[in-house]
Amino acid sequence: MFLMEKLLERVNYILEALPYITQYSGKTVVIKYGGAAMAKADLKESFAKDIVLLKYVGIHPVIVHGGGPEINRLLDNLKIPTEFVHGHRVTDNQTMEIVEMVLTGKVNKQIVSLINSQGGKAVGISGKDGNLAKATKAPIEIELEGKEKQLFDVGLVGKIESVNPEILHNLQKAGFIPVISPVAENSEGESLNINADTFAGEIAGALKAEKLILLTDTQGILIDNQLVTGLNRNKVKDYIRKGEISGGMIPKVECCLTAIDQGVRRTHIIDGRVSHSILIEIFTDQGIGSLIES
């Protein structure tokens, strides 16, 4: 009897997913992959299995990835000094060569191989391939003590100006899973390093994705150390204004707002340290992390 109860419990888990499979089949979900989920072997495997399962039930995942720790490791090994200004890496020509080599040549291909090893058909590209994205240099705004805010040039760091999703549509139609490295060109043909969260938001908007999911190393958006499970634009802006959303969480929530402005229905900031967090978010009634919607 106990065995039968356990089997029925498993069946109920599958049945819980059924309405969500029906709802999202044929739809695009953009996932920003980074943090601990990229570093730990068990989490990497669970991520790859999640992505392959999504594809097999008719959902179209598109992956945008980071890779900061790998970049730092190679720069250290090559004894290339790294300068940061207010948390932003100053990226000269030499550093950009390393960034592109690591992101597009190493990390991207590792993710492709990981997904393919679980039965998927992943293809790795960057923003430069198929004219996917065009970018422009993006100086940062800093405030020095006793002075007004001013722009500071951090080198070959960019923001997305436009996205042409044709290559992604073609890959999806052919049954492939696009894996995108956050490197794009400007009008002068220079390679620029793009914040992966920001890039994911722009990709989601261009594809009119059903969902944007950001994997992070936190439960979601925490206010007074409590997880906030649901927010809208006004609430996010209010938390930023009060300083309750700050630091590295700001570009994450802002990319969610950008995606929403471009037609993405739901955006999620979830804990990538939790095994199978993507499946928990998409296929369970409770979900996981923080939801931001219009």
UniProtKB/Swiss-Prot annotation:
Described purpose of this protein according to its UniProt entry: Catalyzes the ATP-dependent phosphorylation of N-acetyl-L-glutamate.
InterPro entries for this protein: AceGlu_kinase-like_sf (IPR036393), AcgluKinase_fam (IPR004662), ArgB (IPR037528), Asp/Glu/Uridylate_kinase (IPR001048), NAGK-C (IPR041727)
GO biological process, one term: arginine biosynthetic process via ornithine
Signal peptide range in chain numbering: none
Family annotation (Pfam families): AA_kinase (PF00696)
E.C. designation(s): 2.7.2.8
Annotated positions for site Transition state stabilizer: K32, K252
Descriptive protein name: Acetylglutamate kinase
Gene Ontology cellular component list: cytoplasm
Record SUPFAM superfamilies: Carbamate kinase-like (SSF53633)
Record-listed substrate binding positions: G67, G68, R89, N193
GO MF terms, alphabetically ordered: acetylglutamate kinase activity; ATP binding
Pathway(s) served: Amino-acid biosynthesis; L-arginine biosynthesis; N(2)-acetyl-L-ornithine from L-glutamate: step 2/4
